[in-house]
């Protein structure tokens, strides 16, 4: 068994988790926009959420900013790091050397499944910053999916310049852990 966050996985499953695989899965989304229309009730206006994906957001979504002891990740432009992950210049072994690697495993797992999470979303929530006081996340909406005994969360924020949404954070929690969406308004 192996513990990341507080989700316990078997070693066999952890060994399958790969930053390159997550990057390749994420890259597939570059040619797509996910559009959702949500309505709270019949007295409110519908809200359109259109999500776009690009290289620059992968870095934070994957948690690479947490790997403070991997110098190349800290120095290089985010887009360049993404390209080097894709072309194999930066291997999974490089990232696995980090003291903080275990802290990003749930993010990598979430990104590997992001397309399925968005296709099979369970619920969309309006993000309420006061619902999770210990969190520093700044987002507009939470997209939640539950599968295989795990809860996947993908948080999005609206871009001020073009009104499209982008990924702000993603992570996974076990069914026996507190649901991150408690205190947020569901649609």
Q: Model-derived features: where do they sit?
A:
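An acidic, glycine-rich, mixed-charge low-complexity segment common to nucleic-acid enzymes
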Residues: 1-144
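Conserved binding-pocket/active-site segment within a compact domain
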Residues: 110-187
């Amino acid at each position: 068994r192996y513990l990341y966050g507080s989700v316990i996985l078997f070693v066999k499953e952890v060994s399958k988790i790969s930053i390159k695989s997550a990057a390749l899965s994420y890259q597939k989304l570059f040619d797509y926009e996910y559009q959702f229309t949500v309505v709270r009730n019949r007295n409110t206006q519908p809200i359109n959420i259109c999500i776009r994906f690009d290289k620059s957001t992968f870095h934070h979504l994957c948690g690479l900013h947490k790997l403070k002891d991997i110098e190349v990740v800290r120095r290089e432009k985010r887009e360049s790091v993404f390209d080097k992950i894709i072309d194999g210049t930066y291997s999974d072994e490089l990232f696995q050397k980090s003291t903080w690697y275990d802290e990003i495993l749930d993010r990598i797992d979430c990104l590997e499944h992001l397309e399925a999470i968005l296709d099979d979303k369970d619920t969309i929530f309006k993000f309420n910053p006061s619902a999770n006081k210990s969190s520093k996340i700044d987002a507009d909406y939470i997209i939640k999916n539950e599968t295989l005994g795990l809860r996947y969360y993908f948080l999005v924020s609206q871009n001020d310049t073009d009104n499209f949404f982008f990924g702000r954070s993603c992570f996974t929690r076990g069914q026996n852990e507190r649901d991150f969406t408690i205190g947020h308004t569901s649609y």
